[in-house]
């Protein structure tokens, strides 16, 4: 899909300054999508297989909408982009557009944490971030905005997936800058040391501080900052990054690097 990074130029795609810009841009995207989602209650029913009756289907409403969205978007090349990873790869179809000519940017790998992202989103992130609406229970299909909530979920999940899997670009860039160091760590199979080598605690703290400021700023009506109240729980957004987004990104980076030597002169 459209991106601030020129993925047709491998050198630009692996420039850490460009990657950082894209990750900051994705913070905006994720925050705005979450603000849209918290207009609605949790609506647990839409995550239960069969909770909403769908003809000839036994999956949840959210999974159904996510799968069919990916099916449609695959026709316009979304998943030909090296920074996009589907939750339902078997649903993808042949694009109606001619393929884009992407250079080889990433080393061949099969790292995909979408199932974990989806599980954490449904079980942990949403319950923490969705308002209680006076503690009311899910009132059912005819009284709740199930379709709108699930549509927002699709946008949130796709943005989170893209942000987390962008760790591959970070890992490849770091590998190319410190090849000898990472080759030794990879050959030793030392995931802990690799994790420490890719971690910058100061940068992570800046990310969390910036994200909290964005959630507070974007979630406040500038015309009525005192009367309107926050649109989203700032702490919950920050906690989401601290507990899930950053750790899962590092899992992607480490597992990508563990496969980085396959088929190379270092294998």
UniProtKB/Swiss-Prot annotation:
Each dimer has two allosteric binding sites that can bind the regulatory effectors tryptophan or tyrosine. Can bind either one tryptophan or one tyrosine, two tryptophan or two tyrosine or one tryptophan and one tyrosine, which differentially affect the catalytic activity. Activated by tryptophan and subject to feedback inhibition by tyrosine. In the presence of both tryptophan and tyrosine, the enzyme is in the activated state. It catalyses: chorismate = prephenate. InterPro entries: Chorismate_II_sf, Chorismate_mutase_AroQ_euk, CM_AroQ_sf_eucaryotic, CM_II_prokaryot. This is Chorismate mutase. It comes from the Eukaryota. Its EC number is 5.4.99.5. NCBIfam families: CM_pl-yst (TIGR01802). Homodimer. Transmembrane segments: none annotated. Its main location: cytoplasm. One of its GO terms (molecular function) is tryptophan binding. Induction: Not induced by histidine starvation. Optimum pH is 5.9 in the absence of effectors. Optimum pH is 7.1 in the presence of tryptophan. Optimum pH is 5.4 in the presence of tyrosine. Tryptophan broadens the pH range of detectable catalytic activity. Catalyzes the Claisen rearrangement of chorismate to prephenate. Acts at the first branch point in the aromatic amino acid pathway where it steers biosynthesis towards phenylalanine and tyrosine, and away from tryptophan. L-tyrosine binds at residues 77-78, 145, 147-148, 151. Residues 7-262 form the Chorismate mutase domain. It comes from Emericella nidulans (strain FGSC A4 / ATCC 38163 / CBS 112.46 / NRRL 194 / M139) (Aspergillus nidulans).
């Amino acid at each position: 899909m459209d991106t601030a990074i020129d993925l047709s130029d491998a050198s630009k795609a692996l420039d850490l300054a460009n990657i950082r810009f894209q990750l900051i841009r994705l913070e905006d995207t994720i925050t705005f999508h979450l603000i849209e989602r918290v207009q609605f209650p949790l609506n647990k029913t839409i995550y239960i297989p069969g909770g909403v009756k769908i003809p000839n289907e036994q999956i949840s409403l959210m999974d159904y909408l996510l799968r069919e969205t990916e099916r449609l978007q695959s026709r316009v090349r979304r998943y030909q982009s090296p920074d996009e990873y589907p939750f339902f790869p078997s649903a993808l179809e042949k694009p109606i557009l001619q393929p884009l000519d992407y250079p080889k940017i990433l080393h061949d790998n099969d790292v995909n944490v979408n199932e974990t992202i989806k599980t954490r989103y449904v079980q942990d992130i949403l319950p923490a971030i969705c308002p209680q609406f006076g503690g009311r229970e899910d009132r059912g299909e005819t009284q709740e905005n199930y379709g709108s909530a699930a549509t927002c979920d699709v946008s949130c999940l796709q943005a989170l997936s893209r942000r987390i899997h962008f760790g591959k670009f970070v890992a490849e860039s770091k590998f190319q800058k410190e090849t000898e160091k990472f080759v030794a760590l990879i050959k030793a199979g030392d995931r802990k040391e690799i994790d420490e080598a890719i971690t910058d605690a100061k940068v992570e703290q800046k990310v969390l501080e910036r994200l909290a400021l964005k959630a507070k700023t974007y979630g406040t009506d500038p015309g009525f900052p005192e009367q309107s109240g926050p649109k989203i729980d700032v702490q919950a957004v920050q906690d989401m990054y601290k507990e899930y987004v950053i750790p899962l990104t590092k899992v992607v980076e480490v597992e990508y690097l563990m496969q980085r030597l396959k088929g190379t002169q270092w294998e």
